[in-house]
């Protein structure tokens, strides 16, 4: 039987910014849950600022749909979940200083504890919270943290990516484990592996997105890509760029999506349907949802503050 994953990313939930995104996410989850997908994967930037208030709101929504179960939902962290983000142009110059002050370990811990039910107990003798693995049917879902701590040169705005040497070694050991030889390996990570294309309607917007593109890189992506290819990874699911895309590199299929993508009608909601037929056969197809036609387009069961 095909194993179907609903891939969501970059929901950016916030009571202060993007106030409608909680309703949009509810519409999207209603659509997905009603269609009985085997699993849901959310690849980071679930929150806008990484605050406890935002995390509590998302927990409440996921609990409403009975999704706080390891076999139903997998989540990886994004840069907004650690460092937050810029919502006003005047805050751009001070944002690097804000990132420098972030307690990285504390923020990552808050994120992990917010979704503690989703952690797996599959015993592969892993040392840290990332990478993680869960075995669902004949699919091995592997979560990777691509968000490094602040660095003045390497990660001044918190949005660049890197998988450090310790995590890479664990990931390499995990992907080559003999117990996974009959499983389709699906990797979840926040950062992208394709070229970020700047799209804009004017010079000011172009300059902003051009600056953004220079600070959205995944350092060491070629090394990761080679590992994924050599170890037979079937697909990599990611977000970060807010671009809907499917692409293939070195025999590995990639899924890129966002709740409200830059390259589509921003009144519609989006996710990718990842269908795993076997180790050598994975298909990825974008799905568009009109929230106006969704039964969840209502204030029912939404906290009043939203």
Residue spans of the language-model regions?
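Extended active-site neighborhood of metal-dependent phosphoesterases/phosphodiesterases
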Residues: 57-173, 177-181, 227-229, 272-273
């Amino acid at each position: 039987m095909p194993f179907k994953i609903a891939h969501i990313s970059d929901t950016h939930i916030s009571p202060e910014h993007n106030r409608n995104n909680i309703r949009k996410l509810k519409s999207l989850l209603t659509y997905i849950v009603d269609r009985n997908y085997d699993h849901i994967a959310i690849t980071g930037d679930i929150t806008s600022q990484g605050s406890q208030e935002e995390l509590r709101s998302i927990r409440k929504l996921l609990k409403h749909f009975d999704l706080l179960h390891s076999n139903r939902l997998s989540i990886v962290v994004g840069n907004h979940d650690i460092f937050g983000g810029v919502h006003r142009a005047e805050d751009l110059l001070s944002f690097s200083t804000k990132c420098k002050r972030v307690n990285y370990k504390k923020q990552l811990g808050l994120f992990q504890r917010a979704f503690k039910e989703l952690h797996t107990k599959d015993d592969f003798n892993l040392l840290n919270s990332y990478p993680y693995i869960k075995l669902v049917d004949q699919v091995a879902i592997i979560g990777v943290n691509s968000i490094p701590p602040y660095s003045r040169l390497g990660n001044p705005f918190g949005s660049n990516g890197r998988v450090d040497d310790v995590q890479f070694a664990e990931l390499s050991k995990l992907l080559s484990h003999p117990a996974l030889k009959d499983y389709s390996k699906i990797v979840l990570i926040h950062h992208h592996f394709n070229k970020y294309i700047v799209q804009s309607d004017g010079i000011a917007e172009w300059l902003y997105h051009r600056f953004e593109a220079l600070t959205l890189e995944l350092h060491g992506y070629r090394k990761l890509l080679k590992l994924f290819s050599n170890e037979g990874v079937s697909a990599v699911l990611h977000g970060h760029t807010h671009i809907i895309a499917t692409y293939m590199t070195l025999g590995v299929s990639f899924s890129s999506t966002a709740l409200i993508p830059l390259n589509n009608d921003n009144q519609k909601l989006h996710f990718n349907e990842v269908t795993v037929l076997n180790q050598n056969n994975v298909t990825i197809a974008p799905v568009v949802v009109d929230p106006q036609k969704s039964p969840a387009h209502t204030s029912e069961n939404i906290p009043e503050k939203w």
